[in-house]
Every structure is written in structure tokens, then in C-alpha cells.
């Protein structure tokens, strides 16, 4: 293997810094002048500014555009932009690819550069979701409380009571029922959620989500790859993924999860035998997840405060609603607690 010269590394870094910053500026102009979205425009600007210190004079000096063989390489798709969405998608992909190159080759120059570009890449994933994400995903981002159901005879009544308490996000979870029963319950829950303008997701089963026209699906670590689920569900449905550690989080984000579950925070019978990830993982998610995430696992009204203190703003609940005698009141109280950080 030929040893790469410092000049070659410098040229790679220079080209990809240019590529990333140009792509971000293209996206920023749309956010600023067309959408007039201050938050998205500011994020683009901050990303550009975070890259600027790494674009040092020696990298610029290594540039050799006249002799760069890549300047003559073109693809027919480069000249085609069917609409603004396609333009934005192309530039965001360009930025993500450039940041990956900077992450890898930057390590050869300065490990801190590689680490910085890795975090910036995750932020671009979040920017892409906020800019191009479906209306369903945008609604999910506004949900602070997420009910994951458990099997019971009065399932519909319990869920409706929670919806009456202000709940806006429900996941139907039943690992053991026969498919005919699961389909009927999922269909009934979907209709109920629509009456209350709440989102409805199905646990694990992409086929069931499709059969009842759910708003999306939540996948475990052993379920279908996100890319396969996306191909089946289409671009607008919500796809979530359970994660229990930083490695699973990074993989889910890279694969395109719209949101992730972070936990189990505490021991819970719904994850029997699973060691709790603890509040440490919640704290990790605060600074490392660019996509929406819900703390999950053994959370109730008594320990919600410390989960919030660890940085969680969105939580998923099972027993604290499903097993209470007054789901409406329990839901309202949980939402009141969460409203202290989600005014």
C-alpha cells in the first residue's frame, strides 16, 4: 500500500471542507429566504462556522484545481434537480458524505478533527430530518409522552382514557396474541387515535402497520433493517428503533431512524432479564443523539423527575398508565410534570 503524502491528505481535507461548507450554504439560503425559518438557518450557519477553524491555510495552499482529475468527472444526475426538495436532498447528502470523509481522513491530521466532524455529521442528520422529515415525524417531535401498551382485556378503554388525558402518541405492543386478534386491536386503536388526533405506531410488525395504515412502526434490535422497513412503508411513515447503548444508538441514527428509544432506564418486566442502561445512558443521549429520543423502561411519576434531571424531555411509559386505576388522571399528571421542561 502506497503511503499517502501529507499533500494528498491536505488536498482531500480541503476539497471536502469546501464541499461541506458549500452544501450547507445552499441549504441555509433556502431556510433563510424561502422558509424564513430562523432556527434551521441558524443551525446551518453554526455548522459552517464549526467547520471553519479546520480549514487552515496549509490545506488551502495544497489545492491544485487545474491538475485535479476529479474536476472532469460528471454524472448525468448532477444536472437534474426536479424540484427544491431534490435540490435540498442532494446537498444534504453531499454534506453528509463530505463530513464522513473529513471524519476519517481528519484523524490522520488531528484526532480532534475526526471527532468534531463525526458529531457534526449527526447534527446534519437531524437537520435533514427537521427540513425534509414528514409531517408525521414533525408531530412526533412535539410529543413529550409516549404510551407503549401492554396486553389486557380493557385495552381500548385504557388507551382512550389516556387519550382523554392529553396523550398524543401510542404504540401497540403485543408479542403473543394471534395475528387475527392483533390486526383487529391494531385497527381499533388506529381509529381511536385518529379520533383524538394522536399518532399510532405498531411494535415490530411492519406488515401489521401496513395492514391498518398506522403512522409508523417501532423496531427492536432483532427486527427488520430500517432500510427494508422504509422501502415497505414509504418515505412519510415514522420508523423508530430501540437502543440500549451508544453503539446501537449510532447505528440506528446512521441507518435513518426517525427516533430512538433510550433504555431501559430502570429494571422493567417488559424487558425481563435486560440489565438497565441507567441514567448514564440518558445523559449520553442528551449530547449525542441528533434525532428525537424517548427515555424508556420502568419510568413512572415517582422517578420521572430524576429522568428529567438527567436531560430527558420525552419519555415512554407502560405500567404507569396501563396498570393504573385512572389512566386519564395519570396521563394528565405525567404531562404536567413534563410541561415544566416542555412549556
UniProtKB/Swiss-Prot annotation:
Gene3D superfamilies: Aldolase class I (3.20.20.70)
GO cellular component labels: cytosol
Gene name as annotated: thiE
Its job: Condenses 4-methyl-5-(beta-hydroxyethyl)thiazole monophosphate (THZ-P) and 2-methyl-4-amino-5-hydroxymethyl pyrimidine pyrophosphate (HMP-PP) to form thiamine monophosphate (TMP).
The protein, known as: Thiamine-phosphate synthase
Organism: Synechocystis sp. (strain ATCC 27184 / PCC 6803 / Kazusa)
Lineage: superkingdom: Bacteria
Record pathway: Cofactor biosynthesis; thiamine diphosphate biosynthesis; thiamine phosphate from 4-amino-2-methyl-5-diphosphomethylpyrimidine and 4-methyl-5-(2-phosphoethyl)-thiazole: step 1/1
Residue ranges of the region described as Unknown: 1-123
Amino acid at each position: 500500500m502506497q503511503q499517502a503524502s501529507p499533500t494528498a491528505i491536505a488536498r482531500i481535507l480541503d476539497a471536502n471542507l469546501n464541499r461541506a461548507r458549500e452544501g450547507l450554504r445552499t441549504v441555509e439560503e433556502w431556510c433563510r429566504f424561502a422558509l424564513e425559518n430562523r432556527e434551521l438557518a441558524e443551525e446551518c450557519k453554526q455548522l459552517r462556522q464549526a467547520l471553519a477553524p479546520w480549514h487552515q491555510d496549509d490545506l488551502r495552499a495544497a489545492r491544485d484545481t487545474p491538475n485535479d482529475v476529479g474536476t472532469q468527472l460528471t454524472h448525468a444526475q448532477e444536472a437534474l434537480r426536479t424540484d427544491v426538495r431534490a435540490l435540498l436532498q442532494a446537498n444534504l447528502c453531499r454534506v453528509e458524505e463530505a463530513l464522513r470523509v473529513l471524519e476519517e481522513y481528519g484523524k490522520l491530521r488531528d484526532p480532534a478533527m475526526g471527532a468534531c466532524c463525526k458529531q457534526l455529521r449527526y447534527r446534519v442528520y437531524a437537520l435533514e430530518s427537521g427540513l425534509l422529515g414528514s409531517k408525521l415525524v414533525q408531530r412526533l417531535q412535539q410529543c413529550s409522552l409516549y404510551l407503549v401498551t401492554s396486553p389486557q382485556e380493557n385495552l381500548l378503554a385504557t388507551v382512550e382514557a389516556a387519550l382523554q388525558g392529553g396523550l398524543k402518541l401510542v404504540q401497540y405492543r403485543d408479542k403473543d396474541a394471534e395475528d387475527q386478534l392483533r390486526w383487529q386491536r391494531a385497527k381499533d386503536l388506529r381509529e381511536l387515535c385518529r379520533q383524538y388526533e394522536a399518532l399510532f405506531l405498531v411494535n415490530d410488525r411492519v406488515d401489521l402497520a401496513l395492514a391498518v395504515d398506522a403512522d409508523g412502526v417501532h423496531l427492536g434490535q432483532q427486527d427488520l433493517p430500517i432500510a427494508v422497513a422504509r422501502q415497505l412503508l414509504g418515505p412519510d411513515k415514522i420508523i423508530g428503533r430501540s437502543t440500549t447503548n451508544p453503539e446501537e444508538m449510532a447505528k440506528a441514527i446512521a441507518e435513518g431512524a426517525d427516533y430512538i428509544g433510550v433504555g431501559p432506564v430502570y429494571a422493567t418486566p417488559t424487558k425481563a432479564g435486560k440489565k438497565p442502561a441507567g441514567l448514564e445512558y440518558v445523559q449520553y443521549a442528551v449530547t449525542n443523539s441528533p434525532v428525537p429520543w424517548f427515555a424508556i423502561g420502568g419510568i413512572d411519576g415517582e422517578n420521572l423527575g430524576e429522568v428529567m434531571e438527567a436531560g430527558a424531555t420525552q419519555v415512554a411509559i407502560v405500567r404507569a398508565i396501563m396498570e393504573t386505576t385512572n389512566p386519564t388522571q395519570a396521563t394528565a399528571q405525567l404531562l404536567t410534570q413534563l410541561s415544566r421542561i416542555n412549556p
